[in-house]
């Protein structure tokens, strides 16, 4: 079989777009290393066939109940609770699929990592964060993902209303619950030092630089506030 024949046979026989151009996958911002995508489906809605080519960290903003059909496979349910986080390495699977929502809307924020495989730097020498309110969800060469939980619970000696970390790299914070917080992010570059009081809504995001990071809960109507921290721009020491 010739190379041309092989390419023709392997090419999908459907119309599809790259995820960058799928209308329900809306880009919020893009840097050299990260693309932040807000994915929202009304009930009973089917998106276009589309392909993912990068590593993705998916943060579920509301209970998820959709049907996902990868190209060449049968449809399969994708059901997740609010606050769930799942990671997919599309540099490997080159996922081409279509998704259909059910009775409820679908709402996901994706932290899409844009680094090529050859540019990913191992971070096995970087210490994993260990503090009250911090849970490691994912540890792969491309990124580390943590769940930060802020709450004032006198019955739980591990609960905390403030978390302080030393970020080894640039990071993205995605908000799961409406809240007011004070955020400090002090980097080696004095020009980008920040200290601010923020009123954050579900699915909001905050871009962070390497350096000292502190988040303090000011108020919320929720018993606990959760935020997802993705560290994703490791560099060689």
Q: For the regions a protein language model found, what residue spans apply to each?
A:
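A short beta-loop-beta micro-motif enriched in histidine and acidic residues
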Residues: 43-57, 73-74, 153-172, 193-202
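Short, conserved beta-strand element in jelly-roll/cupin
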Residues: 51-67, 165-182, 186
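Residue-level recognition of short, solvent-exposed, well-ordered loop/turn junctions
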Residues: 42, 61, 80-81, 151, ...
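Short acidic-glycine-tyrosine-enriched beta hairpin
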Residues: 30, 70-92, 185-214
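Surface loops and adjacent helix of pleckstrin homology
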Residues: 69-71, 111, 184-188, 220, ...
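A short, N-terminal "cap"/entry segment at the start of jelly-roll beta-barrel domains
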Residues: 2-38, 42-48, 68, 75-163, ...
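Sequence termini and other peripheral, non-core segments
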Residues: 171-172, 196-216, 223-237
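Asparagine-centered strand-capping/turn motif at beta-strand->loop junctions
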Residues: 50, 95-103, 165, 175, ...
């Amino acid at each position: 079989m010739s190379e041309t024949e092989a390419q023709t046979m392997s090419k999908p026989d459907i119309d599809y777009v790259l995820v960058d151009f799928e209308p329900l996958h809306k880009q919020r911002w893009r840097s050299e290393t990260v693309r932040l995508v807000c994915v929202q489906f009304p009930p009973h809605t089917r998106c276009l066939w589309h392909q993912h080519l990068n590593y993705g960290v998916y943060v579920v903003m509301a209970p998820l109940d959709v049907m996902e059909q990868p190209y060449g496979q049968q449809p399969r349910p994708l059901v997740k609770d609010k606050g769930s986080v799942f990671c997919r390495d599309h540099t490997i699977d080159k996922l081409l699929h279509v998704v259909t929502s059910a009775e409820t809307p679908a709402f996901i924020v994706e932290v899409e990592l844009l680094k090529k495989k050859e540019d990913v730097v191992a971070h096995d020498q970087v210490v994993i964060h260990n503090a009250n309110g911090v849970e490691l969800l994912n540890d792969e060469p491309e990124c580390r993902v943590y769940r930060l939980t802020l709450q004032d619970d006198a019955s739980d000696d591990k609960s905390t209303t403030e978390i302080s970390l030393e970020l080894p790299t640039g990071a993205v914070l995605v908000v799961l619950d409406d809240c007011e917080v004070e955020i400090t992010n002090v980097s080696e570059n004095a020009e980008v030092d920040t200290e601010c009081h923020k009123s954050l809504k579900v699915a909001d995001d905050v871009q962070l630089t390497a350096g000292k990071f502190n988040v303090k809960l000011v108020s919320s109507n929720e018993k606990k506030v959760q935020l997802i921290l993705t560290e994703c721009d490791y560099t060689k020491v």
